[in-house]
């Protein structure tokens, strides 16, 4: 599942903190040292390193990284060094700003995280920005997009595997009726997608395909130029096949005229500890090229090195 490679024997946080402190000293920053430590520690270990660094050197490690690094490499290291909830809060805030607005990031956070992970992200958001995520999403969106996104970020889904098949059949019928009527922002359609567990939604969509001959997403393709419809399709993909969703984000980031470093960095840093191996499998299945080779072709230097390290590349 995770692509992150952590050594069997990990140095004490005090040792890692000392090595990082030394990496910032002298005439030039030792980027290789930073990568060799941070890109091979899990979230708990990175959190301990930050705490020890603050205690021993009276400095914030994130501020040190921000001061010493630059460009895409800095962004990747910073995002990776955040705690997961803290990182999601930052990404969500960036996605609501005028010049970095990205509703797809909100869908990613709401639909690919567990209920507890989303809850923790919202707590981190309140602590960091002194406002709620729901409040900001409602303020920065409008119309059908607001109608979809606010309940998405507000929900606390059941995370278990138990499924009500009778409910799945009845709600598949409801969804089909709404799609057939092109009532894409219908209250019941939004209620089902924003409140049901991922297992329940998968069962419902399976009934939809079996009973009506094609998937719900295929029906939505007719109006795929509409941003709301695109978001609706992203919600379905993130809830049911997140690896396919993230593969597409990576493919588009790499294949664009000029790499979309923001999309590339976001996916690698948020999925390396979770399901990046599945995403890599989906990428090679879809593109016939390994993800690490595609990234190596489109990036360079320290930025390339940290991305490859997080992908579990043997030489990074």
From Swiss-Prot:
Binding-site positions, Ca(2+) 3: 299, 304
Record has Iron-sulfur as a keyword: no
Positions of post-translational Phosphotyrosine modification: 129, 283
SMART domains hit by this protein: ANX
SUPFAM superfamilies to which the protein is assigned, alphabetical: Annexin
Recorded superkingdom: Eukaryota
Modified positions (Phosphothreonine) in chain numbering: 100, 112
InterPro entries referenced in this protein's UniProt entry, alphabetically: Annexin (IPR001464), Annexin_repeat (IPR018502), Annexin_repeat_CS (IPR018252), Annexin_sf (IPR037104), AnnexinD_plant (IPR009118)
Annexin repeats: 11-82, 83-154, 166-237, 241-312
Gene3D superfamilies xref list: Annexin
Modified positions (N-acetylalanine) in chain numbering: 2
GO molecular function, one term: calcium ion binding
GO biological process: response to cold; response to heat; response to salt stress; response to water deprivation
Tissue distribution: Expressed in flowers.
Family, as annotated: Belongs to the annexin (TC 1.A.31.1) family.
Free-text comment on this protein's domains from its UniProt entry: A pair of annexin repeats may form one binding site for calcium and phospholipid.
Protein name in the entry: Annexin D7
């Amino acid at each position: 599942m995770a692509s992150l490679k952590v050594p069997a024997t990990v140095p004490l946080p005090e040792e890692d903190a000392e090595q990082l402190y030394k990496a910032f000293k002298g005439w030039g920053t030792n980027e290789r040292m930073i990568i060799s430590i941070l890109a091979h520690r899990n979230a708990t270990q990175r959190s301990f390193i930050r705490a020890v660094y603050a205690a021993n050197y009276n400095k914030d490690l994130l501020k040190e990284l921000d001061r010493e690094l630059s460009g895409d490499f800095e962004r990747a290291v910073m995002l990776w060094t955040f705690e997961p909830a803290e990182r999601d809060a930052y990404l969500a805030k960036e996605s609501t700003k005028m010049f970095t607005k990205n509703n797809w990031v909100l869908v990613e956070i709401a639909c690919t995280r567990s209920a507890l992970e989303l809850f923790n992200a919202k707590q981190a958001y309140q602590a960091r920005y002194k406002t709620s995520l729901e409040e900001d999403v409602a303020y920065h969106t409008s119309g059908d997009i607001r109608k979809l996104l606010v309940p998405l970020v507000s929900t606390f889904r059941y995370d278990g595997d138990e499924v009500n098949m009778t409910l799945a059949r009845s709600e598949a019928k409801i969804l089909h009726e709404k799609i057939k009527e092109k009532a894409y922002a219908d209250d019941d359609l939004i209620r089902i997608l924003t409140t049901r567990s991922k297992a329940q939604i998968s069962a419902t969509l399976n009934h939809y395909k079996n009973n009506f001959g094609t998937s719900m997403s295929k029906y939505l393709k007719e109006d795929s130029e509409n941003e709301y419809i695109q978001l609706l399709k992203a919600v379905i993909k993130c809830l049911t096949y997140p690896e396919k969703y993230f593969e597409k984000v990576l493919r588009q980031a790499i294949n664009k005229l000029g790499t979309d470093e923001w999309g590339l960095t976001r996916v690698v840093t948020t999925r390396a500890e979770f399901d990046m191996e599945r995403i890599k499998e989906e990428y090679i299945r879809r593109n016939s090229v390994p993800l690490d080779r595609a990234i190596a072709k489109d990036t360079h230097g320290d930025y390339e090195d940290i991305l490859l390290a997080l992908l579990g590349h043997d030489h990074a």
